[in-house]
Amino acid sequence: MSDPQPAPSAPRPGRAVLLAAFEGWNDAGGAATAAIEHLQEVWGAVEVARLDPEEYHDFQVNRPQVTLGEDGRRTIEWPTTTVWTATLPTSGRTVLLVRGIEPSMRWRSYCRELLRHADEHDVETVVTLGALLADVPHTRPIPLTATSESVGLQAVLDVEPTAYEGPTGIVGVLQHAAAEHGCASVSLWAAVPHYVGQPPSPKATLAILSRVEDLLSEPVPLGDLPEDAVAWQTGVDELAAEDPEIAEYVRQLEEAKDTAELPEASGEAIAREFERYLRRRDDGRNG
């Protein structure tokens, strides 16, 4: 691993960024990996590498899948990690997208291999995406936490220092490895209501993508995702209404959430939303 280099103060135009998400412990509701899949589609990403699953996975934990083609031939699909690359339409920046399953073993070697691919594409900033189950109501905006081990990024991008202590997943290990490697590193975490933690969770995916858009200063086409998020919330509303105990629990979560928040929206949040609106408007005109 290379010697640590001074981290830049912010992702600079023209310098590559790696965004990564992993199925498993770090991916409540499938929200983080769904965000990577969405970016892969809207940015027209091209596959550039697959990691050998033999090195990192216990196939009794993550079993391969057998599929049948139209000609009846059997194919085995192995659990693996895939790397794609894309060029952002507005800034021209190169982005690497990483999607995989949290490995069963050799996490340090796994991170080193991902960072070798990052070096090949001149990646300066590594952004890990995650989602966790939390005591939050589905009727309120999805809480999103952004943390960084890179001091220069904390003030520039309005992210918090990394303060968590306790068990971690591959997201935390990769974030730390990236910082040790000399990359700026940021971790984005969405809080998914624990009582509806099964995939999909489009409202949480939408929250993650909005923060990615802010981070890269690049409009992200959302397609049907906003409508999917509304439909998801409506569906949960209907389910909660059928069970008085769940409905009361949701009301308690709403009261706790509303009490904890400031009575007025923060200036930073308003500014971010306005900047996002301008980027999408300009992108629509240029398109």
Residue ranges of model-derived segments:
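Catalytic cores of processing enzymes, dominated by hydrolases/peptidases
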Residues: 135-219
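Flexible, glycine/proline-enriched loop segments at strand-loop-helix junctions
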Residues: 22-26, 97-107, 157-165, 195-199
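Short beta-strand segments
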Residues: 20-21, 99-100, 128-130, 189-191
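Internal, conserved structured core segments that host functional sites
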Residues: 93, 100-152, 174
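Conserved active-site and cofactor/substrate-binding residues in soluble primary-metabolism enzymes
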Residues: 27-34, 105, 109, 165, ...
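N-terminal short beta-loop-beta anion/metal-coordinating cradle
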Residues: 1-100
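A conserved C-terminal secondary-structure "cap"
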Residues: 196-287
